[in-house]
């Protein structure tokens, strides 16, 4: 069967001898776009040639499983006379998949080459002039919702790894849990490939089981909400503190210094200019990439015309982007939380259940801007089953001997625990930890993130 737009010279889809398997030949420079619902699994493997998902190259003849995702497999090159191929197992009619040669990958690869050239220039300078060190590119990705910002961040990170660079990936979108849980802001040095089979396509952090990929170790700041507007003052403060941490890492680590920073953001427009301006200042951004919004690029150039060292470029967004509704987003968040504690089909983790006495711990809570006069604070929480059952608690690095909620603003997060039940009569909290052992007696923050096991 030939596919319109690809000519009639090749059989793009063909049945294989195995029951239910379909062979897909992906022409060079084309994409195999896939939409897999939650609770549905797509199994596939690359049989020959080269294929990648947002820059991460897929292994040959290794079965992969993905679920609850809208993604694409890209064929960048052809070996000899073969087409790039994958073999998929179509286990459900709910899976949407099709081939398209309408790809913007060439634009994204060119962007990577520009960023990599900046890294190489900085690296050469730092070798020749060790007393006058420079920093690599600090790239800020901005755009509307559903414009592909996270996909581009993955691609730039994956291609940087292929180029033997070690960038720091910064996630400023609390909706996504990048090597952490939703509600957090993270910064993670990336020196190993991403895990395309994980719930959000990033991978795991250091945890309680052996991993196929090197575990990532992020710095985590707690925001506690998934929408930046629920407490914008707290969001901007935590972004600023994360920026200080990242710049300090660049000062101490020459590999990260040369690799620079890649910053993913929530949906931001010109009305959010103060947020964008703060991010540019906090991370010393020198390259803004605007996805598919020429008006935003023009407005940003006008607003930042006083910053001669700041470059602003626009790249097109993919025509294959699919709108995701709130239900899909929430389900993805739930899957990432579940994976944080339990792992997935390939990586089984060993979470630990225990009871803790609420009187042995100090618990604070995140507050909405509308609830208090000063939104830049955490308030003491009054533990009860109504506000703790099926919730997520953040374990801070502050010992419980500290009694000031203001100190929580300047601390980072050790990890998260899930509260399944609080016994009001006994004052006992039943928690699930991602690691076995004693529960640290540190200050806790009750987030606005709920989860039912």
Swiss-Prot record:
Which keywords label this protein?
A: ATP-binding, mRNA processing, Nucleotide-binding, Nucleus
Q: Looking at the keywords, is Nucleus present?
A: yes
Query: What superkingdom does the record give?
Result: Eukaryota
Compartments it resides in: Nucleus
Gene3D superfamilies associated with the record:
Clp1, DNA binding domain (2.60.120.1030), P-loop containing nucleotide triphosphate hydrolases (3.40.50.300), Pre-mRNA cleavage complex subunit Clp1, C-terminal domain (2.40.30.330)
Q: Name one GO biological process term.
A: tRNA splicing, via endonucleolytic cleavage and ligation
Q: Does the keyword ATP-binding apply?
A: yes
Q: Which residues bind ATP?
A: 31, 70, 146-151
User: Molecular function (GO) terms listed?
Assistant: ATP binding; polynucleotide 5'-hydroxyl-kinase activity
Q: Report one GO cellular component.
A: mRNA cleavage factor complex
Q: Which family does it belong to?
A: Belongs to the Clp1 family. Clp1 subfamily.
Subunit record text: Component of a pre-mRNA cleavage factor complex. Interacts directly with PCF11.
Record function comment: Required for endonucleolytic cleavage during polyadenylation-dependent pre-mRNA 3'-end formation.
Q: What is this protein called?
A: mRNA cleavage and polyadenylation factor CLP1
Origin organism is Scheffersomyces stipitis (strain ATCC 58785 / CBS 6054 / NBRC 10063 / NRRL Y-11545) (Yeast)
The gene it comes from is: CLP1
């Amino acid at each position: 069967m030939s596919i319109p737009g690809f000519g009639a010279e090749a059989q793009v889809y063909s049945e294989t001898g195995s029951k239910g398997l379909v062979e897909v030949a992906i022409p060079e420079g084309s994409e195999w776009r896939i939409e897999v619902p939650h609770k549905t699994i797509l199994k596939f493997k690359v049989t020959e040639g080269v294929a990648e998902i947002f820059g991460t190259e897929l292994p040959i003849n290794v079965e992969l499983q993905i679920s609850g995702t809208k993604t694409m497999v890209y064929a960048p090159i052809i070996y000899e006379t073969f087409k790039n191929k994958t073999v998929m197992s179509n286990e459900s009619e709910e899976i949407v998949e099709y081939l398209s040669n309408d790809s913007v990958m060439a634009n994204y690869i060119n962007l990577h080459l520009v960023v990599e050239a900046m890294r190489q220039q900085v690296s050469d300078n730092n070798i020749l002039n060790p007393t006058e060190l420079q920093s690599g590119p600090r790239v800020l990705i901005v755009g509307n919702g559903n414009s592909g910002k996270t996909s581009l961040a993955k691609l730039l990170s994956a291609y940087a790894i292929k180029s033997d660079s070690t960038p720091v990936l910064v996630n400023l979108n609390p909706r996504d849990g990048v090597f952490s849980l939703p509600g957090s802001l993270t910064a993670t040095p990336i020196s190993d490939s991403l895990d395309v089979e994980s719930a959000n396509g990033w991978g795991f952090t250091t945890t309680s089981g052996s991993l196929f990929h090197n575990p990532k170790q992020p710095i985590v700041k707690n925001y506690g909400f998934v929408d930046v507007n629920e407490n914008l003052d707290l969001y901007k403060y935590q972004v600023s503190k994360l920026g200080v941490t990242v710049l300090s890492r660049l000062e101490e680590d020459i590999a990260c210094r040369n690799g620079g920073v890649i910053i993913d953001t929530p949906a931001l427009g010109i009305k959010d200019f103060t947020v964008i301006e703060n991010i540019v200042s906090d991370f010393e951004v020198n390259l803004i990439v605007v996805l598919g919004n020429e008006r935003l690029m023009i407005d940003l150039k006008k607003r930042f015309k006083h910053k001669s060292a700041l470059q602003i470029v626009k790249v097109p967004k993919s025509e294959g982007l699919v709108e995701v509704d709130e239900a899909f987003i929430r389900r993805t968040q739930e899957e990432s939380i579940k994976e944080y504690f339990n792992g997935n089909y390939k990586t089984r983790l060993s979470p630990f259940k225990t009871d803790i006495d609420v009187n042995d711990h100090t618990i604070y809570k995140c507050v909405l801007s509308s609830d208090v006069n000063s939104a830049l604070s955490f308030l003491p929480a009054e533990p009860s089953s109504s506000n703790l059952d099926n919730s997520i608690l953040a374990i801070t690095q502050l010992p419980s001997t500290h009694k000031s909620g203001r100190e929580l603003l300047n601390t980072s997060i050790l990890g998260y625990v899930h509260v399944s039940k609080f016994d009001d009569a006994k004052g006992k909290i039943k928690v699930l930890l991602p690691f076995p052992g004693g529960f640290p007696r540190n200050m806790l923050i009750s987030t606005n993130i709920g989860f039912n096991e």
